[in-house]
Amino acid sequence: MQELRLLCLVVLVGLAQACPEPCECGEKYGFHIADCAYRDLQAVPSGFPANVTTLSLSANQLPSLPGGAFREVPRLQSLWLAHNEIRSVAAGALASLSQLKSLDLSHNLISDFAWSDLHSLSALQLLKMDSNELTFIPRDAFRSLRALRSLQLNHNRLHTLAEGTFAPLTALSHLQINDNPFDCTCGIVWFKTWALTTAVSIPEQDNITCTSPHVLKGTRLNRLLPLPCSAPSVQLTYQPSQDGAELRPGFVLALHCDVDGQPAPQLHWHIQTPGGTVEITSPNVGADGRALPGVLAASSRPRFQAFANGSLLIPDFGKLEEGTYSCLATNELGSAESSVNVALATPGEGGEDALGRRFQGKAAEGKVCYTVDNEVQPSGPEDNVVIIYLSRARGPEAAATAEGVPGKQPPGLLLLGQSLLFLFLASF
């Protein structure tokens, strides 16, 4: 018995000797505890014994948590960091703590948080992040926290929540999320429905209120009236040349993205050409086709002209403009996308066959396209191909500018029969 006591004393002395200044280390109820609270620390100390299971750094002056801050203590089960001055938690600061069960980051100034670190904390049961400056939580932030029972997010600056944020938390029994400045728009409607039907305890619901829009300020979320909301939908139409039409230099291709949704979706164009990828947040030009103030362009008329009504014009369409044109619409409820492949071919040179081979991204699945009466007939929903034929009979001619009165075809651009260059612009 005396030998056992001596062994325990040696272990405790060794633990105490390994404890960094000015912390105190010891064992209590089978837990190896390192107490560094109220020490005016401005950085996480180093030199902890590897078997520490509880670490308290509360009530210090820590400004941030750098990557690898707790690499020395991989067996931590409880980490207390409340009442510091932490503004940022870097990627890798917490990722090594796979055995962590309790994490308290409350009463700090955190606005920059490495949410991906939570993916490694599958044993976590308590997460306190209340009283910080958080403005956003990624949809997949809690995807690995299936053991989490209590989550505190109250008194932050959260304006909205992505639908499904709490779905992975199958063990959750307590959620505190009051006193956040929620925008009571379509993006928050799902949370109202979830909060009214879930078995999770959500205290202080009288303080889960709207901050905006102004007419709803102060309204309790659980009393919010139904809102007219719908996810985006898109329909992409185009006005290419008729098969065999004679094209002159300066040909303009017109695409139109018809967008629907509530709230009104934001339109974005994604263009993949042989020269690279082009991203355009619509619009980038005014009604006259000239670049809007603040838009970076090589000239006053951008190569790709995105108008506010959903039309996209490509002046001087040529081989460099071949590729895939996609319009994407996004609002608070989701996104939708539609694409079309556009290519040039020269009659008599096997152009159609070559283009067919070029855009067989789904050929292995039996999804190909063919043209009938100048309309694309896709046999698969993803693959639309517009084939534009160039004439070899004429020499180069000067391209006309794209200006003109809507409803009248600018001269010298394209022989389209009854088709009008500004068909799309004039229709809206």
Swiss-Prot record:
GO cellular component entries: extracellular region
Glycosylation, residue list: 51, 309
Disulfide bonds, paired cysteine numbers: 257-327
Listed SUPFAM superfamilies: Immunoglobulin, L domain-like
Source taxon at top rank: Eukaryota
Location of this chain's protein in the cell: Secreted
Claim: Metal-binding is one of the keywords in the record: no
InterPro entries registered for this protein in UniProt: Cys-rich_flank_reg_C, Ig-like_dom, Ig-like_dom_sf, Ig-like_fold, Ig_I-set, Ig_sub2, Leu-rich_rpt, Leu-rich_rpt_typical-subtyp
Annotated ranges, domain Ig-like: 232-343
Signal peptide start and end residues: 1-18
SMART domains recorded: IGc2 (SM00408), LRR_TYP (SM00369), LRRCT (SM00082)
LRRCT domain residues: 180-231
One protein family per Pfam: LRR_8
Keyword line: Disulfide bond, Glycoprotein, Immunoglobulin domain, Leucine-rich repeat, Repeat, Secreted, Signal
Positions of LRR repeats: 51-72, 75-96, 99-122, 123-144, 147-168
LRRNT domain sequence ranges: 19-50
PANTHER family: KEKKON 5, ISOFORM A (PTHR45842:SF12), SYNAPTIC ADHESION-LIKE MOLECULE SALM (PTHR45842)
Identification of the protein by name: Immunoglobulin superfamily containing leucine-rich repeat protein
Organism expressing this protein natively: Bos taurus (Bovine)
Highest classification ranks of the organism: Eukaryota, Metazoa, Chordata, Craniata, Vertebrata
